[in-house]
Amino acid sequence: MPDAPCRNPAALHDRFRLRADGAGSHAEALRGLEVLRRHAVDFNVLTLVSSANQDRPEEVYEYLKAQGVLFHQYIECVEFDGDGRRRPYSPAPGKWGEFLCRLFDAWYPRAARRVSIRLFDSILSRLLTGVPTVCPMAGHCCNYFVVEHDGSIYPCDFHVRPELRLGNIRDTDFRSLWNSPLYRQWGDGKARIARTAPPAGSCRSAWATAPRTA
């Protein structure tokens, strides 16, 4: 399912998503949404929670619903500079959890059967079946592939790096990639960190701060 580009109301969207000329890109994002609708393409919207929208979960959620978006994803946009300082666009400590709590209250129970929020769906799946549907809740990372614009295949959209290139969609089949040693070794990295790192969240921290280019 493709990821649609329109994730926030205009004032929030244009805070960080600017064109090369410095103008906001919200209008273009809306046009992209209409192209998908015109061709009857189901789509998902992945919303980054940043310092711009960290205090406005209800507004973001209601905006997406008003745009007819039924499949929502929300992830925290946390990045640090070379000195370990949180970048200005990253949400403040504690704001991500507060955002999710308020988002859940806006979603449940009124729209829980109509609107899919991937994180909440995965928590429910984990509770009912023991099987999560999102990578951070799993014990390993071999869940999907990413295909770049040139056909190159990588194990994850957060790990698009030359040394992790698995092949190209034009000459490689996914079945062979699924069993490739490089893919399996990379996917077991989370479990290896969990076995060797100290407690108190070190697994998440080490994996989250691994070099990535996506």
What are these regions (language model features)?
Residues 2-3, 29-33:
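A conserved non-catalytic segment of reverse transcriptases
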Residues 15-27, 34-136, 140, 146, ...:
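Radical SAM enzyme [4Fe-4S]-AdoMet core and its adjacent flexible, acidic
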Residues 7, 77, 205:
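Flexible loop residues that form catalytic
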Residues 1-13:
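Conserved SAM/AdoMet-binding glycine-rich loop
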Residues 149:
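A cytosolic small-molecule/anion-sensing beta-strand core signal
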Residues 160-214:
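Flexible mid-to-C-terminal extensions adjoining Fe-S/redox cofactors in radical SAM and related proteins
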